[in-house]
Each structure stands twice: as C-alpha cells, then as structure tokens.
C-alpha cells in the first residue's frame, strides 16, 4: 500500500491479518469517501490469501478507533441522490467486510462512533479496552441524520431493537462495561493486551451471536414490535416537538428492516440518509458542530497562555462549588476554596462529593479515583494557600464594592502573575478592575448554572486586560470541558443581553392576559428546552431579574420590565423552584413532575389569564426581540463573529439547535422578512420592536450573515 494510505495491511507469522487505521496528518481517524478504494484493495488481498485465519482492525491513534465519518463529505453533496449514493457506498463496503469468509475482529480503543461503530458492527466480533476514553455510539441524530452505513439494521439485530432504538434516537454513548453487558462487544480488556486478545479471537471460529434477553425477543415479534414503535414514537414526538425529522425517519427505517428484511432496511436507510442530509435542520445542526469545533480551536488571543498549575476560588456557593468540581475533576488541577463561612466550604466539598459519588454508583468511576479527585479540593476561611495560585476565580455575590474588595485582597495575598477572573453575570469588568494594581490580569469568566452541565462560558476582557490573560483564561475554560466565547465588556455581555428582552416580553404578555402554560408551551414547541417563564423560575426570579435595571440603565427603555410586576412577585416571596414557589408551585424537592402553575400569580400581577394570542404571535414577540438584540451585539462588536453569536445562543440559553442559532435563523427567514415582521410588531406593540439599523440595511441589500455552506462566514 502507498505511504499515504489510511489503512495498512500487515500479515503476521501466525496468518492473522492486522489492518491498522491511521489517517495521515490527523489527530482523529475519520472515514472519508476516498478510503473506499484503499479498503477494497485490502479486501481483495485478503480474499486471495487462502492461508489467512482471521483479520483484526486496530487504530494507530493513541485515543480513538474511528471517531465517525468526515462530515464535510455530506456538505459536499448537492442533492439527496448524491448523499444517498454516499450511504450506499458505505453500506457496500461494510457488507464486503462482513462477507469475508474468515473471522473479522474490531480491536477498539478510544472513541468508536458513527461510521466507526458501523465498521465495528460489520466485523464478526468486537473487543474493546476498559479505558475511560473508550466510548461506543451512533451520534448521527445530533447532526439531523441517521447512521447511513448499515447501523440502523445491524445494531437492532445484535443488541435488540429496544436498546438499539435508545442508542440511535439519542446518540447515547456507551462505556466499555455497558457495551459488554448489552452484547455490543464480546470482551473488555486492558489496553496493553487489546491486540493480543483480538488476535486470539480471530483465530477461533466466528463468535456465535449471543441470545437476546427475553424482553428483546418479545419486542422483536410482530405484536411486541408494533407496541414498542407506537410507544417510542409517542415519547420521541413529545421530546422533539416534531422539530427533528431524523428521529421519525430512524423509527421508520429500523421498523422497515425488521418487518420487511435487511434488503428493504438498507434501501430505506440510504434513501432516508440522502433526504435528511438536505433538510434545513441537518444543515443547521452541522453548522453548529463545525462552529463549536472551530471555537474550541480558537486560542482567544495571539499571546501564548501562561502555565496553569493551581487555581483558587472565592465563594463556596452553588457557582463556586460547581467551578471547583469542573476544575479539580475535569482539569485535574489542585483547587483551594476560600469562604468566610466554614459551611460554605463544606457545601462546595459536598457538591463535588455528590457528583463523584453519583458516578461511582453508576459504575463510571472507581471509589479510589473519586477519593483521588476529591483530594485535589481544599478549603480555608482566610488566604492561606493562595500565595502561588496561577488563577483565582471570584464567585461571590453580585455587588461591585464586594468584588472590588476581592480584587484588592487577592492582589495582596497572591503572586505577581496571578490572574483574577470574576464570575459576574452583569457587572462591567472595567469597573471591577477600576482600583486594581494589576488591571491587565483582571478578566471576566462567566459560567452558567449548573456549571457541570452548561457547556458555554463567556470570557470578558476589559480594555486593559492583557492578551496573555485572555489566552490563559481560554485555556482553562477549554480544559474544564467548556466552549468559550470572548465577548466585549458591555452591560449584560452577550447571553444575558439577548435573553433579557425575550423573558421581559414573556412577562409583558402575562400582564396582557396570556397564560403561563400557554407561553411556555409555545416556546418549547418552537424548540427551546424550557419556556421563558419556567426558565425564570429555574434560574431564580430574584437572580434572573437583577440584571434588568443594569441593562435598562445602559440601553434604555427597550429593556424595561413591565412596571411593578417583578417587585410584586418578589415581595410575595416568590423566588422560583429554589423556594418552591414562583410562577409555578413545586412539590417536594427533587420531584420535578410536581410543578403546576400557581393561579394566584394572575391577580398578583393584575392579569386575568384569559389568553387570546395564537402560538405564532407569542413565539414571534419573544424571538424577534432576541434576534434584534443579537444583531446589535454583532454591530457593537460585543461578539467577535456571528459564529460566536450562534454558539453562545445555542450553548448558553438553548436557542433551538435545529435552527442553527440566531444568525442562521435570520438567514433562513431572510433579513428583509425579519425587518417586515419587526416593523409590524413595532406598529402593534411599540418601539422596542424597531429593527436595528444593521438589520434594515441587510434586508434592503438582500444580504446574509453566513454564506451558503455550513462552515463559511460572510
């Protein structure tokens, strides 16, 4: 084989053929269309060598088997027929591997996802390592697609239809032991003996198919299957609100294969893959994937980052505890928490204990590893142990004087190189750094709650922040598993600035007589994970509304909340879920299904709760304000690019991913159409709906924010 080949054949002395996968010049192995000829050439050699006893596929990469297919291949397809042909080519290749007359074994270490798992499924047996990096899954649904190289047909037959549907419909990734339990792999071994075990398995007869559990056998029959697909269909429709066509097609394709046989199943899979690749939903989801990959490569500034060996945290509350957890347990850095109250330190330590203990219970972590990670976190009520911290994150109350005091104390009690990062959600970083002796080392690092789940962080340099401080803070955020966007130091930054008018408008509609559940249901149907009213309850009404006066002072009356409504709610001791009552009433702690709208909320805010607006009217009033503010943020350079704006909205507030973010959504509607809608709303409801100048100009010129491809900016 030529040197640049991604697949290399080596026949051992014991007549086992080892095919090594190593895509040249790439950290990750991904499958590309041009590899088909390489694999076919190897298959031809395998068929011609009658001495061979077995075949093993193994990766030369240190931490991945095959991470999936190269998504750019799909973007290059101009029609559904071209994408369908791509799927059929993949199916044919997998069929040729499966048809080899000798045992074929996949030796899996690291990520085995998408097309990688489909290749492993085409093999006759699979062995994987017990390493935490080893995960197996079919995540195509997250890109608005389905597995197109036989995965929808092979997986249900291997592990059972019910389990397979859960994996394919959610994109869920399995760890090694879960995969073994379900029968997805035949053995789990240490990395050091992976190839040896795979070779031994290849020397035996083909592994016989493992009998499915009784439940799966029942569900495979016509009656059980009909019941299962009806049930799963309802559940999926409720979860996706009909916004993700891929889930419906997955159900259809899997059922076709089981009811009509694999030939019909493969045909349906290829056709569905081709059609889904052309949907706006898949194009938007792929654009988010490319944008987030791009952001993760962005260093934030041209300067090299400073070393990070240890971190300090001020404040042991919910945010401080969450930040300590991701820093110690994901980055592996020692963390020192300072809180004036020992209870605060205990709270933060318990937070990490609870997270890690949950992993131990689910068998994702060994108890010894839990103890090792917990040992990285320590606490103090003074500044002992802070002298040599490289970066200190402040997570105290939203009070400017208090934060300025924290800066002064940190500068007195830490090293000259220490960075001070404030987890403020609204206060200008320039004001926090106003009296600093080292203002170039002060920066904003805004996490979202809950810290361990929310993928976004906003990094906010003020005018005097150094390039190295930016680069170092971006480096830490990435190590914490976050997607960082660098935003300008203006009131509300980016995420809260576009979120505030959206929530304000929802409250305004309440005062006009709309019902809480109607507003929330409409925005969930639109594609948000929760509605705006429920979101305010979840964040905390007191916390969520603190930013309104800050934004109103900075940007004027378009940020005004309906008069006296917020104060009436807070004066009635309504904080949301955290104290059991907000717009909704909540049952016992931890029982999320118990929430219900509190009818007393309507008289409290002087409303009737007799709704008259249609769903599209409710949605456009909330969403158009968010879009308009997002465009202002680009115009004022609050965000560095529309890429960051789309990522910030999707990862920070759950803007519908299938719409691709605010800027992709504006492009899909057309700037001119957005302007027309906003002008109509401005006539009906007031000047807050006046479209910003940039939007009007783009509408007049027929311009868009993105080019037509998934990856290119205009």
UniProtKB/Swiss-Prot annotation:
Intrachain S-S bonds: none
Gene3D superfamilies given in the database record: 1.10.1040.50, 2-enoyl-CoA Hydratase, Chain A, domain 1, NAD(P)-binding Rossmann-like Domain
GO biological process: fatty acid beta-oxidation
PROSITE patterns assigned: 3HCDH (PS00067)
Chief site of localization: cytoplasm
GO MF annotations, alphabetized: 3-hydroxybutyryl-CoA epimerase activity; enoyl-CoA hydratase activity; long-chain-3-hydroxyacyl-CoA dehydrogenase activity; NAD+ binding
Metabolic or biological pathway: Lipid metabolism; fatty acid beta-oxidation
Residues at the site labelled Important for catalytic activity: 118, 140
Region (3-hydroxyacyl-CoA dehydrogenase), start-end ranges: 306-714
Membrane-spanning residues: none
One GO cellular component, as annotated: cytoplasm
UniProt region (Enoyl-CoA hydratase), positions on chain: 1-190
EC number: 4.2.1.17, 5.1.2.3, 1.1.1.35
Pfam family, one: ECH_1
SUPFAM superfamilies, alphabetized: 6-phosphogluconate dehydrogenase C-terminal domain-like, ClpP/crotonase, NAD(P)-binding Rossmann-fold domains
InterPro entries: 3-OHacyl-CoA_DH_CS (IPR006180), 3-OHacyl-CoA_DH_NAD-bd (IPR006176), 3HC_DH_C (IPR006108), 6-PGluconate_DH-like_C_sf (IPR008927), ClpP/crotonase-like_dom_sf (IPR029045), Enoyl-CoA_hydra/iso (IPR001753), FA_oxidation_alpha_subunit (IPR050136), FadJ (IPR012802)
Locations listed in the record: Cytoplasm
Reactions catalysed: a (3S)-3-hydroxyacyl-CoA = a (2E)-enoyl-CoA + H2O; a 4-saturated-(3S)-3-hydroxyacyl-CoA = a (3E)-enoyl-CoA + H2O; a (3S)-3-hydroxyacyl-CoA + NAD(+) = a 3-oxoacyl-CoA + NADH + H(+); (3S)-3-hydroxybutanoyl-CoA = (3R)-3-hydroxybutanoyl-CoA
Superkingdom assignment: Bacteria
Family: In the N-terminal section; belongs to the enoyl-CoA hydratase/isomerase family. In the central section; belongs to the 3-hydroxyacyl-CoA dehydrogenase family.
Primary role: Catalyzes the formation of a hydroxyacyl-CoA by addition of water on enoyl-CoA. Also exhibits 3-hydroxyacyl-CoA epimerase and 3-hydroxyacyl-CoA dehydrogenase activities.
HAMAP family membership: FadJ (MF_01617)
Protein name (record): Fatty acid oxidation complex subunit alpha
Organism phylogeny: Bacteria, Pseudomonadati, Pseudomonadota, Gammaproteobacteria, Enterobacterales
